[in-house]
Swiss-Prot record:
Belongs to the shikimate dehydrogenase family. It comes from Nitrobacter winogradskyi (strain ATCC 25391 / DSM 10237 / CIP 104748 / NCIMB 11846 / Nb-255). Keywords: Amino-acid biosynthesis, Aromatic amino acid biosynthesis, NADP, Oxidoreductase. One of its GO terms (molecular function) is shikimate 3-dehydrogenase (NADP+) activity. Involved in the biosynthesis of the chorismate, which leads to the biosynthesis of aromatic amino acids. Catalyzes the reversible NADPH linked reduction of 3-dehydroshikimate (DHSA) to yield shikimate (SA). This is Shikimate dehydrogenase (NADP(+)). It comes from the Bacteria. Gene3D superfamilies: Leucine Dehydrogenase, chain A, domain 1 (3.40.50.10860), NAD(P)-binding Rossmann-like Domain (3.40.50.720). It is an enzyme of class 1 (oxidoreductase). Shikimate binds at S21, R22, S23, T68, N92, D107, Y223.
Length: 279
């Protein structure tokens, strides 16, 4: 386990099991780039040990942490969450304000920042259509509501799940049955896939992109493979796209700033570094 005494400020990723993550690669790149003495490690903590580990995070030498499966909901209960974490129902970033352990959800910022960079003015192109009603969808929908998108259609194969999620975000979020996509696509300026369809080992997302307006933006949260069938088809039609790797990189920015006191940039060099690790 890393300690602040030997490495300067430190942060970590808490998960179970401790799967391969690109987060250490990202944060160590920024630490080296800015000459900051510090570190970022992966801590494999089972659910039964999570509360104790988090409550003694600073004792372990950490200024904060990222939290991944299966701990995101429990992290919300053990910390003082901000409005984003509360609305999304999950926390993925922990940090201290004085002696108080606080939490936020940087997936929201990661998603929106990635769109701003990849497709400027994306928020002026009409309705949004979000595919899927799982945990990732909550962060996306909250970000779109926060940005002021007037109408957000939320489609899921089990429409009741979409309805339950939509009810939590107000009248601008409208649940939709999967078989109504053909009617929705012609008025959609932003299409977002939050499902696992198109991920390596999963079937591709079957959707008729020809129905989208020519100025529409297509975003996919999947980043393995980097070029999903959905994004490939969208680019072939001349549509602007935003990939899942961009969201991964941008969501890491806020945590680094909270822990190490400097807001880093998502550079092409960093992107190339992580892309190489994905291959």
């Amino acid at each position: 386990m890393m300690t602040a005494e030997t490495t300067g400020r430190a942060a970590c990723l808490i998960g179970w099991p401790a799967a391969h993550s690109r987060s250490p690669l990202i944060h160590h790149y920024w630490l080296r780039l800015h000459g900051i003495t510090g570190g970022y490690s992966i801590e494999a903590i089972p659910p039964e040990g999570f509360a104790e580990f988090v409550m003694h995070l600073s004792t372990h030498g950490f200024a904060g942490a990222n939290v991944t499966i299966p701990h995101k909901e429990r992290a919300l209960q053990l910390t003082e969450p901000d409005d984003r974490a509360r609305a999304v129902g999950a926390a993925n970033t922990l940090y201290y304000e004085g002696a108080v352990l606080r939490s936020t959800n940087t997936d929201v910022e990661g998603f929106i920042s990635n769109l701003d960079v990849a497709a400027p003015s994306w928020d002026r192109t009409g309705d949004a259509l979000v595919l899927g009603a799982g945990g990732a969808s909550r962060a996306v929908v909250f970000g779109l509501v926060e940005r002021g998108i007037g109408r957000i259609h939320l489609a899921n194969r089990t429409v009741e799940r979409a309805r339950v999620l939509a009810d939590q975000f107000g009248a601008t979020v409208i649940p939709a049955a999967w078989n109504t996509l053909g009617d929705l696509l012609p008025r959609v300026g932003l299409l977002v896939n939050t499902t696992s369809l198109g991920m390596k080992g999963q079937p591709p997302l079957d959707i008729e992109l020809a129905l989208l307006p020519r100025d529409a933006v297509v975003a996919d949260l999947v980043y393995v493979p980097l070029e999903t069938p959905l994004l490939s088809a969208a680019r072939a039609r001349g549509l602007r796209t935003a990939d899942g790797l961009g969201m991964l990189l941008h969501q890491a920015v806020r945590g680094f700033e909270l822990w190490f006191g400097l807001r880093p940039a998502v550079t092409q060099e960093l992107r190339a570094l992580v892309e190489a690790d994905l291959l």
